[in-house]
Amino acid sequence: MDYYDVLGVSKTASPEEIKKAYRKLAVKYHPDKNPGDAEAEKRFKEVSEAYEVLSDAQKRESYDRYGKDGPFAGAGGFGGAGMGNMEDALRTFMGAFGGEFGGGGSFFEGLFGGLGEAFGMRGDPAGARQGASKKVHITLTFEEAARGVEKELLVSGYKTCTTCSGSGAANERGIKCCERCKGSGQIVQSRGFFSMASTCPECGGEGRIITDPCSNCRGQGRVKDKRNVHVQIPAGVDSGMRLKMEGYGDAGQNGAPSGDLYVFIDVEPHPVFERRGDDLILELPIGFVDAALGMKKEIPTLLKEGTCRLTVPEGIQSGTILKVKNQGFPNVHGRGRGDLLVRVSVETPQNLSEEQKELLRKFSSTEKAENFPKKRGFLDKIKGFFSDFTV
């Protein structure tokens, strides 16, 4: 039996052409469409065996070079048991049609694989499950968030058992392939046109049975652990951001990769600065004399220098914002820095002495309209309504 002839394709056929040919023939000879037809059942097994080999690049290369008795062949040829078992043929059928149900390697995985990922544990039909992802919260000071910092976290979870290297068995002879599911972890049953797969009750979906479990992990392949993890937090992070550390979650099972560690950031508020994106806002209260005459003032910053000199122009009004470029927060993606926005608040004096009041009265007597352009404009607008108003 030549596998290419069975599928009706050339030896140079692409993987897509091979899959297309198999799907057409598998549907044609599927037992649900041909109940009681022994010849159709035989053809279904043959096309499934051919597809199992030709759809695998490594097996196909070996088949092209050595034929059915190549180094990857089992006791019954490339199909393991020559596809004599209908269960194997149905499993191959589901694998070929699995991509239509979520892109998984089988019908069962296509339906249910996404749920495992949502909870941080991805699995395959042979029972290998990625370790669960972990999450921790870390609180930073405002300054630490601005400059970046390295933190050490204590993380509890599971690590790979060093005694058995994650196999769960005391030695190599302590593991055997599950005879019921032949290592797939699934039992395939025909339920209408699309066959269904269920977890193998013999091995619990693991695809293998541990006959001599490891004494350290009791057959689990991993043990509870607490470890210190060093986290390098970049400058510019903000509350609500998270860092992903691949492979720092729980150890996987049956050789599957470890989960990830997610570090959620909280940043404490600052008594002086307010953050808005990459910009910093500083409220600067000044007296009305400084507002009128202008001034130069040292103001705080988050840079190493600690301060910078700000020029307040004369005649500045309350609420005016002065921008100091590149004195804000660093961008977490390395795109420069934000600005320092200084919001001026002109404070009206309180608790004046008689001498101060007298000086203000003298100043008031010298006021001119051009000293208060907003006041003059306001009075001009309402002059027609209130005749007793004078300037």
From Swiss-Prot:
Its cofactor is Zn(2+). Keywords: Chaperone, Cytoplasm, DNA replication, Metal-binding, Repeat, Stress response, Zinc, Zinc-finger. GO terms for biological process: chaperone cofactor-dependent protein refolding; DNA replication; protein refolding; response to heat. Residues 2-67 form the J domain. It is found in: Cytoplasm. SMART domains: DnaJ (SM00271). Transmembrane segments: none annotated. InterPro entries: DnaJ (IPR012724), DnaJ_C (IPR002939), DnaJ_domain (IPR001623), DnaJ_domain_CS (IPR018253), HSP40/DnaJ_pept-bd (IPR008971), HSP_DnaJ_Cys-rich_dom (IPR001305), HSP_DnaJ_Cys-rich_dom_sf (IPR036410), J_dom_sf (IPR036869). Zn(2+) 2 binds at residues 178, 181, 200, 203. A zinc finger (CR-type) spans 148-226. Participates actively in the response to hyperosmotic and heat shock by preventing the aggregation of stress-denatured proteins and by disaggregating proteins, also in an autonomous, DnaK-independent fashion. Unfolded proteins bind initially to DnaJ; upon interaction with the DnaJ-bound protein, DnaK hydrolyzes its bound ATP, resulting in the formation of a stable complex. GrpE releases ADP from DnaK; ATP binding to DnaK triggers the release of the substrate protein, thus completing the reaction cycle. Homodimer. This is Chaperone protein DnaJ. The gene is dnaJ.
